[in-house]
């Protein structure tokens, strides 16, 4: 356990204490020997990387590289984390021993440290079962959304998913869901973090995962949950007869992750011919050998093999899941022969329009609209707001991340409301509220049905997107980031924005663009509110300022919770009838250039631009 601040221990003494404790506790021969080797070599630099600071447990759980030490994902840190989580749950739920928890995992592995998602999941299960708590442990890999689905379906106290989603291959993660089926939000992260610090010494049975196989407390939910998930999914199939007859062909890639068999099953549930799978990428492979980054959000580079297969099989649509299948990218072949990869905001517009249109056909009574909702995050396109204003349902924005949308959706559902859809620009979609998180499996098959239906009207996805913008107003978006590894520099950049025109004066313009409103969710300031106080929750630990411009533009600058990035998201919203998207794009590009030049000031702060 790290020496507490003010304990009088210097940096070297603290490092010595951490490594000594590690040698005493670690029973994984690979990580134990790695630390012994570093000590023998006197490799202080590497030891500091491994032991400098314990991984911080946040609302997204843990995410870090696999390897030895307290700053990495490994057997010992998984045991310590789970012991803390277990003790925290015992305090929160008096019926934990009756209800239990669910654990699943993706296909990640790190042979040099002996770490893998499956191994970590079994160690986590061992921790809970040793305390008399039932564990529903999937016997094989699943998509991340199967964990929140299982929590809700079986009415469990919590869920754990071992995954690093679309991160580089060396990483892994530990994602946590609460009994409401949504990701945890504060203050649970702080409570769990404190409980981890109080339970660092491994419990007697912590390392012996063979004990769980004969335990009556171990349950395998795979078959029943698989069946229940696809039965629930069928309720979102609106055009079964169209699906049976469609001539539209699809290609699917799971990018070496878990999605392949689940998307095949989803297509069968909708009576669609299953998509052609990219053979080099369909099976799980923790090395992700065919891609630089296993992230379909990176666009065409990840989709090269998909496009080649689609060209060969004459498929018009490519569907791409990230490795844990909670996100989805869609690309469509244009008449020119070029491939168009839809942005997260564009697919959000298409899916939102589709789910509302399909719901409206089944609900002719307009009075139901007053209890109908869609959600998106504050940095995502406001296209759903435009559709809601015209059609009469409710739109709400939340803070960034599905933890906020999932928790808000659950509140609304508990109040008897209907939540049709939620999305975020980072290609995350909740099309079916039986999963209170983003779900790339349901999004893939619903996108396929949408494309099949449009084909009966001789429309492509691109043509329908244009029709949505013509009817509800063009929403042109642009997002990017700068890399900055120095937290003090990031803080200074944002503080300077808060005192741009003298102390405590935010900027009144950005270049030639006049600013009409400012919301600062770090300080809680919002000059659009009568009392100047922001309505959305605020957080002093992360930077986030939104500027609204007189020309209808909105831009948000924020820090990333998981990467050394300052991100920006800009959007220009035009009223219906403005059908000159090229002019809007030009104006948005000018606005973004002004923001980069005047607000980011990359030369002054030594920021690295996003690599092309």
From Swiss-Prot:
Catalytic activity entry: alpha-D-ribose 1-phosphate = D-ribose 5-phosphate; 2-deoxy-alpha-D-ribose 1-phosphate = 2-deoxy-D-ribose 5-phosphate; alpha-D-glucose 1-phosphate = alpha-D-glucose 6-phosphate; O-phospho-L-seryl-[protein] + alpha-D-glucose 1-phosphate = alpha-D-glucose 1,6-bisphosphate + L-seryl-[protein]
UniProt subunit comment: Monomer.
Active site, renumbered: 165
Species in which this protein is naturally found: Pongo abelii (Sumatran orangutan)
PROSITE patterns per the UniProt record, alphabetical: PGM_PMM
InterPro entries for this protein: A-D-PHexomutase_a/b/a-I (IPR005844), A-D-PHexomutase_a/b/a-I/II/III (IPR016055), A-D-PHexomutase_a/b/a-II (IPR005845), A-D-PHexomutase_a/b/a-III (IPR005846), A-D-PHexomutase_C_sf (IPR036900), A-D-PHexomutase_CS (IPR016066), Alpha-D-phosphohexomutase_SF (IPR005841)
Purpose of the protein: Catalyzes the conversion of the nucleoside breakdown products ribose-1-phosphate and deoxyribose-1-phosphate to the corresponding 5-phosphopentoses. Catalyzes the reversible isomerization of alpha-D-glucose 1-phosphate to alpha-D-glucose 6-phosphate but with a lower catalytic efficiency. The mechanism proceeds via the intermediate compound alpha-D-glucose 1,6-bisphosphate. In vitro, also has a low glucose 1,6-bisphosphate synthase activity which is most probably not physiologically relevant.
Similarity comment: family membership: Belongs to the phosphohexose mutase family.
Protein's recorded name: Phosphopentomutase
Keyword entries, A-Z: Acetylation, Carbohydrate metabolism, Cytoplasm, Glucose metabolism, Isomerase, Magnesium, Metal-binding, Phosphoprotein
Cofactor binding: number and manner: Binds 1 Mg(2+) ion per subunit.
Residues that hold alpha-D-glucose 1,6-bisphosphate according to the record: 63, 165, 326-327, 400, 424, 438
Compartment(s) of residence: Cytoplasm, Cytosol
Modified residues (Phosphoserine): 165
């Amino acid at each position: 356990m790290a020496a507490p601040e003010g304990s009088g221990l210097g940096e070297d003494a603290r490092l010595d204490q951490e490594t000594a404790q590690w040698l005493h506790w670690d029973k994984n021969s690979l990580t134990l020997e790695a630390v012994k080797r570093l000590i023998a070599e006197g490799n202080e630099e590497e030891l500091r990387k491994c032991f400098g600071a314990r991984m911080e447990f946040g609302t997204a759980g843990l995410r870090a590289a696999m390897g030895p030490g307290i700053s990495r994902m490994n057997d010992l840190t998984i045991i310590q984390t789970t012991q803390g989580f277990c003790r925290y749950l015992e305090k929160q739920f008096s019926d934990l021993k009756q209800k239990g928890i669910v654990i699943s995992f993706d296909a990640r592995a790190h042979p040099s440290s002996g770490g893998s998602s499956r191994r970590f999941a079994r160690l986590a299960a061992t921790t809970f079962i040793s305390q008399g708590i039932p564990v529903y442990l999937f016997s094989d890999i699943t998509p991340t959304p199967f964990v929140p689905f299982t929590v809700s379906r079986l009415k469990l106290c919590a869920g754990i998913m071992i995954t690093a989603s679309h991160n580089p291959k060396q990483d892994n993660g530990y994602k946590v869901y609460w009994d409401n089926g949504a990701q945890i939000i504060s203050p649970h992260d702080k409570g769990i973090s404190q409980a981890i610090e109080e339970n660092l010494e491994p419990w007697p049975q912590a390392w012996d995962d063979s004990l769980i196989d004969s335990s009556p407390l171990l349950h395998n939910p795979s078959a029943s949950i698989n069946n229940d998930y696809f039965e629930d999914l069928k309720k979102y199939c609106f055009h079964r007869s169209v699906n049976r007859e469609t001539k539209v062909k699809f290609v699917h890639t799971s990018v070496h992750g878990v999605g392949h068999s689940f998307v095949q099953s989803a297509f069968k549930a909708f009576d669609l011919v299953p998509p052609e799978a990219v053979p080099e990428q369909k099976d799980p492979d923790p090395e992700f050998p065919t891609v630089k980054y296993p992230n379909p959000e990176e666009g065409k580079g990840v989709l090269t093999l998909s496009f080649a297969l689609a060209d060969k099989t004459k498929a018009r649509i490519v569907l791409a899941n990230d490795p844990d299948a909670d996100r989805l990218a869609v690309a469509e072949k244009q008449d020119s022969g070029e491939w168009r990869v839809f942005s997260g905001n564009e697919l959000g517009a298409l899916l939102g329009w589709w789910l509302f249109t399909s719901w409206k056909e089944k609900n002719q009574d307009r009075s139901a609209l007053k209890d109908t909702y869609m959600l998106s995050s504050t940095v995502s396109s406001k296209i759903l707001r435009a559709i809601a204003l015209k059609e009469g349902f409710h739109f709400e924005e939340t803070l960034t991340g599905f933890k906020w949308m999932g928790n808000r959706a659950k509140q609304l559902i508990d109040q008897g409301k209907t939540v049709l859809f939620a999305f975020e620009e980072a290609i995350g979609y909740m099309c079916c509220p039986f999963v209170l998180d983003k779900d790339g499996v349901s999004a893939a098959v619903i996108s396929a049905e949408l494309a099949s239906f449009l084909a009966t009207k001789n429309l492509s996805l691109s043509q329908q997107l244009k029709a949505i913008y013509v009817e509800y107003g063009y929403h042109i978006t642009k997002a990017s980031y700068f890399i900055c590894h120095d937290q003090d520099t990031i803080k200074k950049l944002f503080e300077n924005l808060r005192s741009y025109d003298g102390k405590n004066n935010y900027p009144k313009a950005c270049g030639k663009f006049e600013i009409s409103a400012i919301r600062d969710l770090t300080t809680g300031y919002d000059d659009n509110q009568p009392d100047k106080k922001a309505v959305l929750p605020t957080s002093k630990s992360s930077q986030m300022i939104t500027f609204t411009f007189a020309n209808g533009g909105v831009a948000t600058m924020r820090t990333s919770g998981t990467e050394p990035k300052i991100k920006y998201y800009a959007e220009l919203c035009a009223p219906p009838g403005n059908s000159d998207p090229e002019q809007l794009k030009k104006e948005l590009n000018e606005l973004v250039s002004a923001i980069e030049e005047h607000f980011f000031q990359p030369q002054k702060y030594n920021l690295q631009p996003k690599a092309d």
